[in-house]
């Protein structure tokens, strides 16, 4: 069994797939409670973003969640005043941003990138009356601070479903004689060799192989969450290697547009990419942050405690699929997608069923979930039981960091 770095991570970055809005400075946006009627209660919420909504991916997806939660809370008589800080780096500027939002009177401060957590944790002890959230992170379950929280979603469920869509297209190409079975090769643009990315592309691959048994995958890591040029270059290189399907764990739309320019297919992440690649992009999946934001903000409004480590999936609509591009999807895809989604929701299908993959030719019988001593090697909590590896069961942040057969890593990037 090969164990690789099990540190979880997230997206975000300064690279843009579309031109940035020059009128939007780095830093705070004035408090905005939107057009909803004022409620009986008001919660002031700070949101620290590594990018802005112009990325059309990672940060844009957070803004979409923020807006949906605000609307839902208004219907409950809770008014939300948002103070948003854009384009904050994973450095001391994040510490400053947390301090500024705390001093501005925020009741709750949300940090949207993995690299923000160490800086958030420097600030949180000084403001015990304020709740601090680090999305996609992992320290709160053991940091001994009562006012810090982590949150993530079971995005591997959506990845698996996107893989099913990709696999059905590949099998159609085989059946129609467009490619031979051995040419059903997926190219995957990954950010870093972290557990979140590994978990994502492994679940995607398993979904594809469930309907296209001959599929294989090549993974190219770009060493950045958001570098539109490098993402495009990686997608182009993968297509040149013979990959006929491209997917991604990166923030921009350039893998989609590159796939279209290369005449291959694509599945996306964080946003519907059909608009930029209508002849290539089949579907995407994204985390829906609205249920968590609504839960956390409502708890603060009511003076109630809330989970320090929160994770849900399709069971609470925290993971959703983008629209299926039925113009290019294989026949029967919509029906198959609905069938498999119901199996995931009901628990009948386990994404990391250990009977569906091997590691160096052997079935996985044991794997630890948590790294308790900081050496990047899991050493606690058996994750394999009842015939499956149980991802995000012991903590919200992913910890599946195994290199399974059928997936070729072309490089590694640990940041």
PLM-predicted stretches and their roles:
Residues 17-415:
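A residue-level marker of the well-folded mature domains of exported/periplasmic proteins
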């Amino acid at each position: 069994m090969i164990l690789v770095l099990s540190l979880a991570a997230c997206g975000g970055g300064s690279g843009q797939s579309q031109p940035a809005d020059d009128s939007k400075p780095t830093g705070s946006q004035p408090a905005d409670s939107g057009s909803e009627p004022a409620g009986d209660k008001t919660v002031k919420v700070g949101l620290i973003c590594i990018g802005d909504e112009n990325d059309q991916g990672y940060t844009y997806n957070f803004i979409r969640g923020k807006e949906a939660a605000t609307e839902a809370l208004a219907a409950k008589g809770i008014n939300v005043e948002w103070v948003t800080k854009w384009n904050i780096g994973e450095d001391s500027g994040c510490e400053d941003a947390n301090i500024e939002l705390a001093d501005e009177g925020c009741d709750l401060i949300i940090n949207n990138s993995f690299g923000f957590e160490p800086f958030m944790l420097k600030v949180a002890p000084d403001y015990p009356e304020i709740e601090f959230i680090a999305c996609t992170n992992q320290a709160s379950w053991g940091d001994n601070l009562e006012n810090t929280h982590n949150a993530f979603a079971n995005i591997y469920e959506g990845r698996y479903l996107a893989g099913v869509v990709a696999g059905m297209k590949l099998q159609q190409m085989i059946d129609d004689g467009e490619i031979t079975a051995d040419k059903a090769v997926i190219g995957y643009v990954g950010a870093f060799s972290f557990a979140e990315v590994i978990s994502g592309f492994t679940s995607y691959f398993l979904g594809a192989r469930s309907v296209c048994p001959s599929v294989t995958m090549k993974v190219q890591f770009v060493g950045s969450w958001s570098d539109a040029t490098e993402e495009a270059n990686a997608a182009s290189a993968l297509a040149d290697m013979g990959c006929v399907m491209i997917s991604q764990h990166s923030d921009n739309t350039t893998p989609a547009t590159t796939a279209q320019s290369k005449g291959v297919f694509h599945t996306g992440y964080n946003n519907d990419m059909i608009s930029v690649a209508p002849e290539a992009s089949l579907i995407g999946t994204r985390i829906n942050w609205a249920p968590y934001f609504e839960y956390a903000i409502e708890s603060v409004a009511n003076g109630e405690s809330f989970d320090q480590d929160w994770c849900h999936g399709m069971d609470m609509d925290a993971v959703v699929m983008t629209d299926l591009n039925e113009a290019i999807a294989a026949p029967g895809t919509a029906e198959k997608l609905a069938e498999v989604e119901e199996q995931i929701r009901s628990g009948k299908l386990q994404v990391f069923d250990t009977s569906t993959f091997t590691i160096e030719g052997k079935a996985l019988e044991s794997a630890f979930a948590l790294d308790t001593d900081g050496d990047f090697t899991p050493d606690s909590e058996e994750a394999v039981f009842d015939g499956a590896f149980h991802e995000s069961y012991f903590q919200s942040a992913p910890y599946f960091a195994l290199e399974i057969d059928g997936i070729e890593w072309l490089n590694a990037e640990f940041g």
